[in-house]
Every structure is written in structure tokens, then in C-alpha cells.
Amino acid sequence: MRIRPADAKDLDAVAQSYRDLLMHEMEQTGYSNWKFGVFPTMEISHRAHNRQELYVAEVKGRLIGSMILTERQPKEYKNISWNTTSPDEKILVLQVLCVRPQFSGKGCGKSLLRYAGEMAREMGYSAIRCNMWEGNEPAIHVFRQMNFTDAGSGPFRPEGLPEEQDLFMEWDLNGDDRNRY
């Protein structure tokens, strides 16, 4: 598996991976609380790509997952009692981590998180923060396995969606956790 910054040629495949996941969730159990045609969208991936914040995972040239890594913290983050007290410029935010359903459970999500942690450490960040719908139990389980700790829960409004109750999580990159994953 190769993880790298996204190229413009990846954008269609990223959008298709969002559709694949949402179609799968419509047919099976849905955990993301995302909505088909509303969130996430091609526009979100374009914006992230233009800001150089979109990363993709691929196997043999086929996109199997993606994530957004940004320094911009959503306004709701101000209401959370985070475990680390680092200044904002030392925080990286992980958003819209998506793994194609046929690759779920095969380590792609963990590899993306591992990459985010390694990259953040190299760039001098002290923590990675994220949030997800409280009902996304599979993702919560994986994030906890990968050094993220719960920081609290509260309302969050994803772009274009109604407000939901989210779990806010944080990975303290200065902690002695490198052997956990």
C-alpha cells in the first residue's frame, strides 16, 4: 500500500470512493452518518486538494482510501476540553477518512492513521484531533487502537448536514505510544 498527497487525477476516484461507501451503507449497516450527495462530496475533495490537504492510499495504482489533514480546526473544537494544551499551530486535524468498503478490515484505515501520525511528528505537530459521529463504533474502535483518546462529546454540524452528536478524539504525539500500533 502506498500513501501519498493526492494529485488532480485522483479526485474522481476519491469522489467515487465516497459514493461506494455510501452505497454500501445504504445496503448494509451505516456507521458514518454521512449522506449520499450531501457529505462528503467532490467539492470537499477538490477544496482539500487545492489546499494540499488531501491524501490517498492506493494498491497497484487503485485508490482504496483517502483522508484530509488540515490545520483548520472546526469552531466546535473550541468547546472541547482537549487532553493536550498545545497551541493551535501545533495541532493537525484529520477529517473525512474514507476506506472503500471492499478494503474495510484489511488495515487501510490503520495505515492512513499511521501515516498521519508519522507525517505530523516529522512536521512538528504535537497532536492530531478528529471527530466522528458517536454511532460510528467501528471507526471509534480503530482510532482507539491507534493511540487516539476520547476528549469529549458534543454537537457538531458537518458541511450540509444537520447537527449530530460527535465524539471528539485526540492523539498526543508527544506521548510514549509508538509501540501501540
PLM region spans:
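Conserved GNAT-fold acetyl-CoA-binding loop/helix
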Residues: L22-I44
